[in-house]
């Protein structure tokens, strides 16, 4: 429960701060136009739609819901699976191996992806402004009514493949934590989380673009391979990295905030637990 609360708090805090960049990233990913807008142009377009900076927080509620739920569940499942796999190898000196980290984070990622995919479908559609959902609840209702279970799991295959991004990130993060011989400081946590996220993002970002486009499209005949070929034909290799700048500007600070809050909240619970014993 402590891990879930820490993860939920971390996910909520980071999403509240970084939402405008997520909005820009989704809109850039969803665009199939050959002429790409810059990050500044996307912000300007959103603000110009109603003349208020509040437009940059369009869809905030569904984003907070998804991030809080996914991070809370992820850290809880990851911590549980990590303890299980480590207990199966008693001669590990208390250190988790690369394979154990990949297995634990991969398992947690698959479970969370299955649980939260409908939230991300509604989020992608609200933030891309391709549909006129008045609120997230109407979005879920419309999605289930018109597209059923298949619509709820649009983009699920790339999400599962994208689990490897989280696995790569946690593998790098755990190894960096072991590299620090002393107790890590807040600055150490920021550096380790940023480095691990950049490492994973560069390798796996094209899957996020394909996932967003599958979720935004409402055609029942959407195909991953057709979308990959269409993106390559119309936009080339750069098409698979549309929105990468706002993605990095968002996820690196967001990951730093998430992991720092998670580690600090987790440390608080450990301290309180030791005092009560």
UniProtKB/Swiss-Prot annotation:
The chain crosses the membrane at residues 3-24, 60-80, 102-122, 152-172, 190-210, 240-261. InterPro entries: Mitochondrial_sb/sol_carrier, Mt_carrier_dom_sf, SLC25A32-like. Keywords: Membrane, Mitochondrion, Mitochondrion inner membrane, Repeat, Transmembrane, Transmembrane helix, Transport. PROSITE patterns: SOLCAR. Solcar repeats lie at residues 1-84, 96-179, 184-268. Coiled coil: none annotated. It is a multi-pass membrane protein. Belongs to the mitochondrial carrier (TC 2.A.29) family. This is Uncharacterized mitochondrial carrier C27B12.09c. It comes from Schizosaccharomyces pombe (strain 972 / ATCC 24843) (Fission yeast). The lineage of its organism: Eukaryota, Fungi, Dikarya, Ascomycota, Taphrinomycotina.
